[in-house]
Regions:
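Intrinsically disordered, low-complexity acidic regions enriched in Pro/Ser/Thr
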Residues: 1-131
Length: 131
């Protein structure tokens, strides 16, 4: 199965203002945590063209949460998400965010799921307790 490199953390740190405005239009819940930065480009034959991402609210809002990988994940938007690195348009923002340790890169199989179980967020095998 193919793997991709994803940024995991508060997506507000790595997206442009316009992209973040698009993200904020979604009303995320544990059953529907996926969105698209360019929904007008969505196609079942080229799913990645729409630049998909996944995002979930933290149970306790902003702060710093520790992942099962022992790393800290900082939050300023009350949410943690993941997006494939090749879907991030502003690589400079990504580099700055990684340098500051606000979020981290992870390799996931494209089929790895993510979800929320009462504040326990998971991305593949990575778990982040936010409750």
């Amino acid at each position: 199965m193919a793997t991709r490199t994803y940024f995991v953390g508060d997506l507000c740190y790595v997206l442009t203002r316009d992209e973040w405005d698009t993200v904020c239009l979604y009303d995320f819940d544990p059953e529907d945590n996926e969105g698209f930065l360019e929904p007008e480009k969505f196609s079942w034959t080229d799913y990645q063209a729409a630049r998909p991402f996944e995002m979930m609210r933290t149970a306790c809002g902003d702060g710093c949460y520790e992942g099962s990988d022992g790393k800290s994940y900082y939050v300023d938007s009350g949410s943690i998400g993941r997006i494939a690195v090749d879907c991030i348009s502003d690589k400079e923002k990504l580099a700055e965010t990684l340098e500051k340790g606000l979020g981290h890169l992870h390799e996931f199989d494209e089929e790895d799921s993510c979800g929320d179980d009462d504040g326990l967020l998971w991305f593949g095998e990575l778990e982040i307790q936010t409750a």
